[in-house]
Amino acid sequence: MRLRIAILIDDFYPSSGGIGRSVETQLEELTALGHEVTLIAPDRHLQKPRIGRVIECPTLYVEGLPAHLSILHWSKRRARLISEVASFDVVHTQTERGALGLGARIARLQGIPHLHTFHANIAGTHQTVHGATFGTLGYQALILPGLRIARGGGRAPSARLPAATSETGGLAARTDWKSFATIAQLADAYTVPSPFMRDLIDEAAGRRLPGYVVPTGYNRRMKRAIDEAPRERADGAIRFLSVGRLAKEKRLDVMIKAFRRAALPHAELVIVGDGDQRDRLKTLAMGCDSIDFRWHLSSTTALAYEFRNADALVLSSYRFDSQALVIAEAVSAGLPVMYCDDRLTVGVSPRTALLTGPDVASMAQGFRTLADGPLRASMAAASAELMPDLAPARTAERYVEAYTDLIERKATRG
């Protein structure tokens, strides 16, 4: 069955980090499966994809602010205008701002199911970003009431705080999961990239909701670039690689301290990325010639070169990432992975990755463990076992299964 799918996103496309990359994969892979995909995205900073259809939507946004503060217009009029030019079989929203309300209105107008994907673990921001509480309050004061209005009113679904043992990030973090559980019940179903997110949402809802775990697979262009990149190292050093934003929640300060404590001869740490922690991290690395900052690499070829010439990927975030897409990229490059967040289960296994504690001493020991060449070689070889489940086509197939299930259930309910 050929489906007509509307994908809605508040963030600028495609330059908005992991969410933009996930949406890009969805567009490409769903189209490759023969489905008709329409992207409804902000009309600012838009780089139109060469496939599918694009409907540009006005957005509330002040230039210069972060992209996650962009809000699509979600009025009844906007939903009606879109419905006059396009009919869909399913609406799939990707962000919890204007896109969520607009998607709900379109679904209601056209009598079709509404699927929502929770990409980000916003509950993980509270441990390092002090202003994150304002986001929690924003959900309670604006997003949830707005979504109820878009759905046509009615009683608010029941939700509760998950247990403090399930979410250890404090009251604000537990409140975020309660908000997610409310949103999940106001949509027809939801998806998440990792099992732990589904468990927390369903716990907050007090019951098992219609939900699906759909990890984002590796990017085909990145995989092709990695395969084509030359391996140009003959120095004999062990190169550990970190890729991502230089932000507090990524805890690169812990990584740098751990690497320095490990004091490995003939080892280097290459850090790719940029962000507001740049100066602090440079200061922490001062005097250590084996730590090299490559800053932001916008070229796929340049980033692929770093993966190809590394010996292991290191991830230091803890209780923040929802999936960590960089793990899928590391697997596609055949790299062992060292990480410290036990809730991350996508793209890792005991044969391919080393789980450490989140503290400096534990990560330092992890660096020492991965200094073992035969161990790294064994882990790299085992990474091939994970590739089929991380294939981007598998991501699209899982979404189609969810769409079909929702459409059939809605038809049965009449």
Give residue spans per PLM region.
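Short alpha-helical donor nucleotide-sugar binding micro-motif in glycosyltransferases
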Residues: 184, 296, 305-310, 399
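Conserved donor-binding/catalytic core segment of Leloir-type glycosyltransferases
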Residues: 191, 230-259, 270
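Acidic donor-binding loop of glycosyltransferase active sites
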Residues: 89, 188, 308-322
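Donor nucleotide-sugar binding/catalytic pocket of nucleotide-sugar-dependent glycosyltransferases
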Residues: 139, 143-226, 235
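Short hydrophobic beta-strand element within catalytic cores of glycosyltransferases
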Residues: 327, 332-339
